[in-house]
From Swiss-Prot:
Protein name: Capsular polysaccharide type 8 biosynthesis protein cap8A
Domain of life (superkingdom): Bacteria
GO annotation (BP), single: polysaccharide biosynthetic process
Membrane topology type: Multi-pass membrane protein
Recorded family membership: Belongs to the CpsC/CapA family.
GO MF annotation, one: carbohydrate:proton symporter activity
TM annotation in the entry: 20-40, 172-192
Compartments where located: Cell membrane
Keyword Cell membrane set for record: yes
Keywords: Capsule biogenesis/degradation, Cell membrane, Exopolysaccharide synthesis, Membrane, Transmembrane, Transmembrane helix, Virulence
Amino acid sequence: MESTLELTKIKEVLQKNLKILIILPLLFLIISAIVTFFVLSPKYQANTQILVNQTKGDNPQFMAQEVQSNIQLVNTYKEIVKSPRILDEVSKDLNNKYSPSKLSSMLTITNQENTQLINIQVKSGHKQDSEKIANSFAKVTSKQIPKIMSLDNVSILSKADGTAVKVAPKTVVNLIGAFFLGLVVALIYIFFKVIFDKRIKDEEDVEKELGLPVLGSIQKFN
């Protein structure tokens, strides 16, 4: 019975503040839409892969050892891809359109565990640039590693052509997140309003807050 009364009271409070519950989420939604579509710059990500591959051989035992050795080299090669030497060469390959430090901030290097694959991911504000830069990293790396490591065991597995996708801003996530944030803010506002606003506004408040019957009311005259 007590819980039913509490639920009824909550329902009444929400109904009284229905405008706030509608206006604040919509306001947050509109602000998020403006920021997402007109303020934030789009980001595109392109991906390419290079393979640390074994040398040719007929001995299965030798080939297995070579594969294991190449897997162990992957971490070293990942660091080489991010090194100043590679960044400088990529910058030159792109006619110095991007500085080495800028290229470094656009670059992400990953690899799947226990594989010989290195994934090169590049984020840029332009779709074509993302693909072009990713391809440049793959090309430069495959040329420079034999000079650095004295091992010619790197090849380009897949180019970035046609792989660029928009990764930011996340329109749906931003809009839904803003709507629910507005809803939470509205509920918090209503909660504090109920807690701290003790003003009596109508006959119903007199009966509830003071426990006194209302005998009559005075009309408001202009």
